[in-house]
From Swiss-Prot:
Family listed: Belongs to the AIR synthase family.
Top enzyme category: ligase
Localisation: Cytoplasm
Quaternary structure (record): Homodimer.
Molecular-function GO term, any one: phosphoribosylformylglycinamidine cyclo-ligase activity
Cited SUPFAM superfamilies: PurM C-terminal domain-like, PurM N-terminal domain-like
Record-listed E.C. numbers: 6.3.3.1
Pathway assigned in UniProt: Purine metabolism; IMP biosynthesis via de novo pathway; 5-amino-1-(5-phospho-D-ribosyl)imidazole from N(2)-formyl-N(1)-(5-phospho-D-ribosyl)glycinamide: step 2/2
Name this protein carries in UniProt: Phosphoribosylformylglycinamidine cyclo-ligase
Coiled-coil ranges per UniProt: none
Gene3D superfamilies per the UniProt record, alphabetical: PurM-like C-terminal domain, PurM-like, N-terminal domain
Cytoplasm recorded as keyword: yes
Organism, scientific name: Shigella flexneri
């Protein structure tokens, strides 16, 4: 016989019962995202999904992403209900720029100590993002790892798979001199530049919960969920000849627009075509951030830029604005052998 205390997994910091409670809590919201192609439900070792029958030569498109240090701001302000939307948006917006329809999404949620309420809020946000983009939340991993994260801090990552007809892949190869650039307005900084945002808050001594901007707390502007453009863009692609789409994420204008430009072309952006949302003016002023750095770090009010032939512009703008987007002509494509792929003037 021994008088040693019997240890359990819970004694080591892993609460399986909490994990099971979380699964029970989220089943309903996850079920709402289900597409007809998905087979089975939550709890299997793997998720099964058939390809939609309308595709003749389907090509799968995949992407994975996180939300960067926007997550730190959300944790500090104890606002967990929209960070899941951000996570989905960062993945599905990357897929749709290639013409792909998102099919299914998986998430990874890791924490030192699982708080069921917090995790449920995050995953409910993920389900909402999936509803907005028309994809199914088919599974995920909730990892409780004591000693790896401080307290109830957590991290999230997402993985998405979509499908596009092989002949309809959008890769920028059709972009040519004279194409027009259309902008889609952003909902705020989206999920990029938050290390600089947090540094500006620190240096300025500003409390985002008590500082007001345009009649609401600065925190509301900074934590506004990333806009999901999937449904609007998919309809646009069906009805308009789209040559390229750039998702303005990390690297801003300078790095993301060139990713979809063929050689010997240059994007010329008309800075007078829009006004920065007030949150970007605040960030620039409070942080004394140079203009070039603003365009490299933030989207400055532009979430996506679409290149298309000039005759298609009016139709595209009408369709996008009818679908609730804030869309406008932001520039043109010029033939150029300059090393400067993007000009903002």
């Amino acid at each position: 016989m021994t008088d040693k205390t019997s240890l359990s997994y819970k004694d080591a910091g892993v609460d399986i019962d909490a994990g099971n409670a979380l699964v029970g809590r989220i089943k309903g919201v996850v079920k709402k995202t289900r597409r007809p192609e998905v087979m089975g439900g939550l709890g299997g070792f793997g998720a099964l999904c058939a390809l939609p029958q309308k595709y003749r030569e389907p090509v799968l498109v995949s992407g994975t992403d996180g939300v960067g240090t926007k997550l730190r701001l959300a944790m500090d302000l104890k606002r967990h209900d929209t960070i899941g939307i951000d996570l989905v948006a960062m993945c599905v917006n990357d897929l749709v720029v290639q013409g792909a329809e998102p099919l299914f999404f998986l998430d990874y949620y890791a924490t030192g100590k699982l708080d069921v309420d917090t995790a449920s809020a995050v995953i409910s946000g993920i389900a909402e993002g999936c509803l907005q983009s028309g994809c199914s939340l088919v599974g995920g991993e909730t990892a409780e790892m004591p000693g790896m994260y401080h307290g109830e801090d957590y991290d999230v990552a997402g993985f998405c798979v979509g499908v596009v007809e092989k002949s309809e892949i959008i890769d920028g190869s059709k972009v040519s001199d004279g194409d027009v650039l259309i902008a889609l307005g952003s909902s705020g900084p989206h999920s990029n530049g938050y290390s600089l945002v947090r540094k500006i808050l620190e240096v300025s001594g500003c409390d985002p919960q008590t500082t007001e901007l345009d009649g609401k707390p600065l925190a509301d502007h900074l934590l506004a969920p990333t806009r999901i453009y999937v449904k609007s863009v998919l309809e646009l692609i069906e009805k308009v000849d789209v040559h390229a789409i750039a998702h303005l994420t990390g690297g801003g204008f300078w790095e993301n627009i060139p990713r979809v430009l063929p050689d010997n072309t240059q994007a010329v952006i008309d800075e007078s075509s829009w006004q920065w949302p007030e949150v970007f003016n605040w960030l620039q002023t409070a942080g004394n951030v140079e203009r070039h750095e603003m365009y490299r770090t933030f989207n400055c009010g532009v979430g996506m830029i679409i290149a298309l032939p000039a005759p298609e512009v009016d139709k595209a703008l009408a369709l996008l604005n009818a679908n609730g987007e804030n869309a406008w002509k932001i520039g043109i494509i010029k033939a150029s052998d300059s090393e400067q792929r993007v000009v903002i003037e």
